[in-house]
């Protein structure tokens, strides 16, 4: 007669290490300590006394600026006023830590510029598997697998003027990461009679940047901008 034996092994600790009465007492004690901690926070005002972190000689008792001190915490966000989406910033890359740094930098920049923002939202991660031959001759039958993971995150800006959004995006583009791809979508809101305002415009004033240019390409661009077909599609 064949007998099969089964053996099991688990590294999980015991669920109940305390008796029921000891567990109830522990929960009550934790509730009392939490209430005491909340009362102490509401009554006692904590003193702001940051440390001086610098290798140079500084003025005595000179504190660190508050915006530098806030780098240790999550980015602050302003509340929405109307909830109108004005811009969407999508970032993607292969290193998730860099995406978090870029997202927090954009959130901190928007906070100091007065732009209400959404939290940093994670989008669907893209995973791809590539299979190629190892070499075209002797090892042509040998295959190699390459696994690529692309992370994506998104930020949404609300209730801000177009000029502020352009300034915010230009500052982010100026300090961008080389291994992170940025994609911004800007939304603009116009009145209901916007098409009538466009029809009422008879002439479009070109910028002065095209004046006095001898470049034939620039002259051709100026000619196309003045053409009737361009104004018709505009």
Swiss-Prot record:
Boundaries of the annotated transit peptide in chain numbering: 1-23
Keywords: Mitochondrion, Ribonucleoprotein, Ribosomal protein, Transit peptide
GO cellular component, one term: small ribosomal subunit
Gene3D superfamilies for this protein: Ribosomal protein S10 domain
Biological processes, Gene Ontology terms: translation
GO molecular function, one term: structural constituent of ribosome
Cellular compartment(s): Mitochondrion
Role description: Component of the mitochondrial ribosome (mitoribosome), a dedicated translation machinery responsible for the synthesis of mitochondrial genome-encoded proteins, including at least some of the essential transmembrane subunits of the mitochondrial respiratory chain. The mitoribosomes are attached to the mitochondrial inner membrane and translation products are cotranslationally integrated into the membrane.
Family to which the UniProt record says this protein belongs: Belongs to the universal ribosomal protein uS10 family.
Assembly and oligomerization: Component of the mitochondrial small ribosomal subunit (mt-SSU).
Name listed for the protein in its UniProt record: Small ribosomal subunit protein uS10m
Native source species: Candida albicans (strain SC5314 / ATCC MYA-2876) (Yeast)
